[in-house]
Swiss-Prot record:
NCBIfam families with a match to the protein in the record: PhzF_family
InterPro entries on file: Phenazine_PhzF-like
Residues annotated as catalytic: 46
Name of the protein this chain belongs to: Uncharacterized isomerase PA2770
Phylogenetic lineage: Bacteria, Pseudomonadati, Pseudomonadota, Gammaproteobacteria, Pseudomonadales
EC assignment: 5.1.-.-
Amino acid sequence: MELTIFQVDAFADSPFQGNPAAVCPLDAWLDDERLQAIAEENNLSETAFVVGRDGDYRLRWFTPQVEVDLCGHATLATAWVLIHKLDDASPVLRFATRSGELSVRREGDSLAMDFPAKRPEPCATPDGLLEALGIAEAEVLKTDDYLVVVDDEKTIAALAPDFARLKGLPCRGVAVTARSQRFDFVSRWFGPNVGVNEDPVTGSAHTSLAPYWAQRLGKTRLSAEQGGARKGRLECDVRGERVVISGKAALYMSGTLHL
């Protein structure tokens, strides 16, 4: 069996930026063990598998270790492949996923993804969280991630987490965020529980980050940058119970899987 595969840098306008994702279009689903094996072999933070045509698709995402419920950057990468490599001219691409229906539309030279908003709630700071991050004091909130809000964006740039300690926490991942001089906010995201120590640009985390900062800053349109050494940029628009997350993407390579 031969399958075409693409590697796309999401939330970037050229290669070597943003967050790389593999995209594998399928005529029909392979068994779950084979999908997981492909994702493990790719060894990227996410591999997306997509089935469908003409604007109507089913989409699944796998890290090297597990299938996940939502992945923003791999959704962006998938939409880019469908539009630019598989010639889908539909004005809106719709994806049936484990998180419900998601849609992506073109907005100029960007792609806009419509996701359910997740509003973080204040919570008690779990034992070991701040110590694992090397942070003395922070505001802590929770959705499926812990959101750790610090006062200075320089703190985020200097983070060197203890991933073994983070892995024991009861969450999908940990997003650390702060106000920024160049953007409305910046962040980094760590997910050793799903096999990704640090994800360069995490679209799904912004379904929580954007509502938090929208409320705090009193605005619904927000600019964001995420990442440590490798960074990407996002535009977020909080619309009630939805968040529209926009960004660009760039093809890095394409090839053939021999299974």
